[in-house]
């Protein structure tokens, strides 16, 4: 936050009473920051079917078939792939949704988040 001090001096009633002297008025101006962003990443494994990964990308990250396939192949070939960049709360929710969905379907797919 930024602080601005304004000093006002003045005399009233002859200058020797309680109404004379210096007054400091502090005005505070809040400075907002953009929230930190987090990358949501899928990790490759040898057991989760490629079709399931594509389905996850379409369902939870609103990717079209071409983008989902491209990301899935990147995960398959490089071991990790980015699904999207979100604020902390959204990223945390996406990771939780993907992990729960993978467990429900008995796949070991891992999804993590990291600060960008």
Curated annotation (Swiss-Prot):
GO biological process, one term: protein catabolic process
Region (Disordered): 1-23
A Pfam family annotated for this UniProt entry: ClpS
Feature: compositional bias, Polar residues: 1-11
Highest taxon in the source lineage: Bacteria
Family as reported in the entry's similarity comment: Belongs to the ClpS family.
NCBIfam families tied to this protein: PRK00033.1-2, PRK00033.1-5
Record's function text: Involved in the modulation of the specificity of the ClpAP-mediated ATP-dependent protein degradation.
Assembly and binders: Binds to the N-terminal domain of the chaperone ClpA.
Protein name in the entry: ATP-dependent Clp protease adapter protein ClpS
Gene source species: Brucella melitensis biotype 2 (strain ATCC 23457)
Gene: clpS
């Amino acid at each position: 936050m930024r602080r601005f001090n304004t000093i006002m001096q003045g005399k009233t009633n002859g200058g020797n009473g309680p109404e004379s002297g210096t007054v400091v008025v502090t005005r505070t101006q809040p400075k907002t920051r953009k929230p930190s962003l987090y990358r949501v990443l899928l990790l490759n494994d040898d057991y989760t079917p490629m079709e399931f990964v594509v389905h996850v990308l379409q369902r939870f990250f609103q990717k079209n078939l071409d983008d989902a396939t491209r990301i899935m192949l990147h995960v398959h070939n490089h071991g990790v792939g980015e699904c999207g960049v979100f604020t902390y709360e959204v990223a945390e929710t996406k990771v939780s949704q993907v992990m729960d969905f993978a467990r429900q379907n008995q796949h070991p797919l891992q999804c993590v988040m990291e600060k960008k």
